[in-house]
C-alpha cells in the first residue's frame, strides 16, 4: 500500500462541481487498489481499499458484471482521471462520461459514480471516513506551508530583480539616455510601499478561498513540485537512517534556515575554532601577515 500512499501524495487537488455542491479531491489508482481524499473545505475524508474490497463491493453494486478487480480499477481510473485532469476547465461543452453525486452523513461521505462498463451500467460508491490528522498534515498543512515559503522566496527574488533593474535604469539615465515614450516611465521600486498597498488593495481578493477552485486552478503545479520535494527528502532521510529534521521537510527547519542565512552573509570575517586559532597565534609574524592578506582579498558584495 506504500505505492498508493505515495501516489496519492504526488497528485494535485482537483476541483469537482457536483449537483449538490463542489469538492476538492485527489485520487491514486493502481492495480493493487485505490486511495481517495475529498474535502468540502470543512472536513477531509479518506478511503483506501485493496483488490479484495474492490471485488466484494463490485459484486454488491453490479450483480450483472463479472470481472477481475484490476478491470474495475482500470475503469475507475478511466472515469476519474479526465475529471481530475481537466478540473480547471470543466464546462458544459465537455461533459463527463460518468455522473457523480455525494451524500454526507455524520461519520461518512459517500461519493456515488454511475457509468458504463462493456455496455452495461456500472455503479461505484466511495465510502470515505474522516481523515486522520496525519493525512491532513501530509496532504494539506505541510505542502501548503511549503507552497507559502516557495511563493515568499519567489517574491523576494522578484523584489531583488526589480532593484537591480532600477540601478540599471539609473545608470542609463546618468549616461544621458532618455525615454522616447514617456508612458513607459516608472518610479523606482519601493518594497515597503508596495507591500502596504498590496495589503490594503489586493489582499482581500487575492486570499478569497471561495469554493477552492482558484487553488485547484492556479497552484496545481507548485503543489506537486513541493510534495515531490518533500517525498524525496523523506526517502533520503529514511535511506540514511538519520532523524527527519531536514529544513526541506520541516517547517521549523525551513524557518530556522531562513533566519540563519543573513547571519552567515553579514559575518565580517571567517570564524575559526579554538584548536585552529592557537597554532596560528604561535606561528609568528609570517602567518599573521598571511591572515591579514587573506582578509584583504575577501570578496565584497555587489552593492557593498
Swiss-Prot record:
DNA repair protein involved in DNA non-homologous end joining (NHEJ); it is required for double-strand break (DSB) repair and V(D)J recombination and is also involved in telomere maintenance. Plays a key role in NHEJ by promoting the ligation of various mismatched and non-cohesive ends. Together with PAXX, collaborates with DNA polymerase lambda (POLL) to promote joining of non-cohesive DNA ends. May act in concert with XRCC5-XRCC6 (Ku) to stimulate XRCC4-mediated joining of blunt ends and several types of mismatched ends that are non-complementary or partially complementary. The keyword Repeat does not apply. The coiled-coil region mediates homodimerization. Residues 258-272 have a biased composition (Polar residues). Residues 133-175 form a coiled coil. Residues 293-304 have a biased composition (Basic residues). The modification Phosphoserine is found at residues 137, 250, 256. Homodimer; mainly exists as a homodimer when not associated with XRCC4. Interacts with XRCC4; the interaction is direct and is mediated via a head-to-head interaction between N-terminal head regions. Component of the core long-range non-homologous end joining (NHEJ) complex (also named DNA-PK complex) composed of PRKDC, LIG4, XRCC4, XRCC6/Ku70, XRCC5/Ku86 and NHEJ1/XLF. Additional component of the NHEJ complex includes PAXX. This is Non-homologous end-joining factor 1.
Amino acid at each position: 500500500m506504500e505505492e498508493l500512499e505515495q501516489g496519492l501524495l504526488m497528485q494535485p487537488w482537483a476541483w469537482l462541481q457536483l449537483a449538490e455542491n463542489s469538492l476538492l479531491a485527489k485520487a491514486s489508482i493502481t492495480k493493487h487498489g485505490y486511495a481517495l481524499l475529498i474535502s468540502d473545505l470543512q472536513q477531509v475524508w479518506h478511503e483506501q481499499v485493496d483488490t479484495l474490497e474492490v471485488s466484494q463491493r463490485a459484486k454488491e453494486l453490479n450483480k450483472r458484471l463479472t470481472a477481475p478487480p484490476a478491470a474495475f480499477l482500470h475503469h475507475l481510473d478511466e472515469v476519474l482521471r479526465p475529471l481530475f485532469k481537466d478540473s480547471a476547465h470543466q464546462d458544459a461543452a465537455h461533459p463527463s462520461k460518468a455522473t457523480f453525486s455525494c451524500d454526507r452523513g455524520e461519520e461518512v461521505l459517500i461519493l456515488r459514480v454511475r457509468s458504463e462498463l462493456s455496455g452495461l451500467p456500472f455503479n461505484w460508491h466511495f465510502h470515505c471516513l474522516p481523515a486522520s490528522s496525519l493525512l491532513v498534515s501530509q496532504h494539506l498543512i505541510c505542502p501548503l506551508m511549503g507552497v507559502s515559503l516557495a511563493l515568499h522566496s519567489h517574491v523576494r527574488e522578484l523584489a531583488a530583480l526589480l532593484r537591480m533593474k532600477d540601478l540599471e535604469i539609473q545608470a542609463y539615465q546618468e549616461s544621458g539616455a532618455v525615454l522616447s515614450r514617456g508612458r513607459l516611465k516608472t518610479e523606482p521600486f519601493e518594497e515597503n510601499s508596495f507591500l502596504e498597498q498590496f495589503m490594503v488593495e489586493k489582499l482581500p481578493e487575492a486570499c478569497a478561498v471561495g469554493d477552492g477552485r482558484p487553488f485547484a486552478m492556479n497552484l496545481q503545479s507548485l503543489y506537486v513540485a513541493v510534495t515531490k520535494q518533500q517525498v524525496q527528502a523523506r526517502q533520503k532521510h529514511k535511506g540514511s537512517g538519520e532523524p527527519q529534521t531536514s529544513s526541506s521537510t520541516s517547517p521549523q527547519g525551513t524557518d530556522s534556515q531562513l533566519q540563519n542565512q543573513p547571519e552567515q552573509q553579514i559575518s565580517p570575517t571567517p570564524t575559526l575554532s579554538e584548536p585552529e586559532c592557537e597554532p596560528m597565534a604561535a606561528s609568528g609574524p609570517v602567518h599573521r601577515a598571511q591572515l591579514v592578506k587573506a582578509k584583504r582579498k575577501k570578496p565584497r558584495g555587489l552593492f557593498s
